[in-house]
């Protein structure tokens, strides 16, 4: 509890980071809590196609006359969940194999680095388009795994470099001399000293996963099922909403939702870097 109060105190001294933290909480509430209190309105209403913002429809309506605000509320859960899972999978994968490569060294290090180098040479967007077009993933888990497999190489190299520097520290040498085992050395001695680095990378990986997910949905490379901010953008484009004078709200709403959530994440990550780094904190 004292640690949480200290964190909030440090965060309060960074207005941009505090705004980002509040923004993240707002969108998490919007995506996961608000749907319990706001009924889904997905029935087409042809008489209200592309309505301008009003008291009845604060963000206007779409090409089927459905309320845009209602879609924003229900469209956040899918895109945020996939982004979170993709960041989680890629972070765990990179940390595990990056730490093993640095700790074991030798042939294991060479093999892992070789695979990483090959992965880094492949254009990620092209590979993603090909994989998505072939597999046509529709579930949270499959899409998150695909995104994670494209994100891990760059982090793995960074984790390896961090572990290489930590393995020479006195407390790691002491653990090794006590024969505490590889698992203990990596997960009890090294990784706790990298937690700030891991948290910041996780946040940034989530932003990348959300943007990438939005791109492949907008391009129509995966089945358009459920409610999703990116699906709103796809239909806004495919239904020609951009050509209707009063329909810009239908396009602008999901763009702002994605952009503001991403901005909140980046602002929070920047503040966390200041808080976790004593040199930046004292600057």
PLM segments and residue spans:
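Periplasmic/extracellular loop-to-transmembrane helix junction in inner-membrane transport proteins
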Residues: 4-13, 42-87, 234-252
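Generic hydrophobic transmembrane alpha-helix motif, especially the helices
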Residues: 58, 62, 68, 89, ...
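N-terminal signal-anchor/first transmembrane alpha helix
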Residues: 1-42, 112-115, 194-195
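C-terminal transmembrane helix and the adjacent membrane-cytosol boundary/short C-terminal tail
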Residues: 139, 149-150, 196, 202-204, ...
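Glycine-rich helix-loop "coupling/hinge" segments at transmembrane-helix boundaries
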Residues: 133-134, 163, 212-253, 257
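Transmembrane alpha-helix signature in integral membrane proteins
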Residues: 21, 68-103, 261
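Transmembrane alpha-helices
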Residues: 77-93, 183-216, 265
